């Protein structure tokens, strides 16, 4: 499992030091080494770290589907630390989260901005969380298409369509009115963890891990 497992955001990891910690486990059949992300995947933990783009989204989707196949009745925990990124890549993760049978719990560590915030809010109801010093930011989708005037007009209309769809989904997941979402995403809107909970983007702020009694 150590090779066909979770190897994500290698550039971010290399920038942080170049080495991924390894975990050694012993069993009756001897020792086995896992990189730390692979070991956590065994515990149904997935990391969404860095910009949301197609390659990273494919890895997250694959892990969601794998964990569903392993146990369709046990929660999956998605840890998010992302500045946002591609809408289409993010929507592939979103649709898979809604499609699979297990509940997907979302936890923001660091930041969840733009598409990262959208995915944070898309977790299972009652299972969306932030750590206390993380931040969340929502805004409207960005566009920067260049080309012929007619093509620019086509892409501008598509951005408006995407904006409308994202606003509808965000209203659904937060419980806010559509008009409130439209107003609050007009510009970059940063929130503390506590404010994100008040707004409905998350359900609670975690100070300490909740241990089973």
From Swiss-Prot:
The keyword Methyltransferase does not apply. The active site is at 114 (nucleophile), 139. Keywords: Cytoplasm, Hydrolase, Protease, Serine protease. GO terms for cellular component: cytoplasm; endopeptidase Clp complex. It catalyses: Hydrolysis of proteins to small peptides in the presence of ATP and magnesium. alpha-casein is the usual test substrate. In the absence of ATP, only oligopeptides shorter than five residues are hydrolyzed (such as succinyl-Leu-Tyr-|-NHMec, and Leu-Tyr-Leu-|-Tyr-Trp, in which cleavage of the -Tyr-|-Leu- and -Tyr-|-Trp bonds also occurs). Its main location: cytoplasm. InterPro entries: ClpP, ClpP/crotonase-like_dom_sf, ClpP/TepA, ClpP_His_AS, ClpP_Ser_AS. It is an enzyme of class 3 (hydrolase). It is found in: Cytoplasm. Disulfide bonds: none annotated. Its EC number is 3.4.21.92. GO terms for biological process: protein quality control for misfolded or incompletely synthesized proteins. Coiled coil: none annotated. One of its GO terms (molecular function) is serine-type endopeptidase activity. It comes from the Bacteria. Belongs to the peptidase S14 family. HAMAP family: ClpP. NCBIfam families: clpP, PRK00277.1, PRK12553.1. Cleaves peptides in various proteins in a process that requires ATP hydrolysis. Has a chymotrypsin-like activity. Plays a major role in the degradation of misfolded proteins. Fourteen ClpP subunits assemble into 2 heptameric rings which stack back to back to give a disk-like structure with a central cavity, resembling the structure of eukaryotic proteasomes. This is ATP-dependent Clp protease proteolytic subunit.
């Amino acid at each position: 499992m150590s090779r066909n497992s979770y190897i994500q955001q290698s550039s971010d990891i290399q920038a942080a030091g170049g080495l991924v910690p390894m975990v050694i486990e012993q069993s009756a059949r001897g020792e086995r080494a896992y990189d730390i992300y692979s070991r956590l995947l065994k515990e149904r933990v997935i990391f969404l770290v860095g910009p949301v783009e197609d390659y990273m989204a494919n890895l997250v989707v694959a892990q969601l589907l794998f964990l569903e196949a392993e146990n369709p009745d046990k929660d999956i925990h998605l840890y998010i630390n992302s500045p946002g990124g591609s809408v289409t890549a993010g929507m592939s993760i979103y649709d898979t989260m809604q499609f699979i049978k297990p509940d997907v719990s979302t936890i923001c560590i660091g930041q969840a901005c733009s598409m990262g915030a959208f995915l944070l809010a898309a977790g299972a109801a009652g299972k969306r969380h932030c750590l206390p010093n993380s931040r969340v930011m929502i805004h409207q989708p960005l566009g920067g298409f260049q080309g012929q005037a007619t093509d620019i007009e086509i892409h501008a209309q598509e951005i408006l369509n995407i904006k409308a769809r994202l606003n509808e989904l965000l209203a659904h997941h937060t419980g806010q009115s559509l008009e409130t979402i439209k107003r609050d995403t007009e510009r970059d809107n940063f929130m503390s963890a506590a404010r994100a909970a008040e707004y409905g983007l998350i359900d609670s702020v975690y100070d300490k891990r909740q241990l089973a009694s």
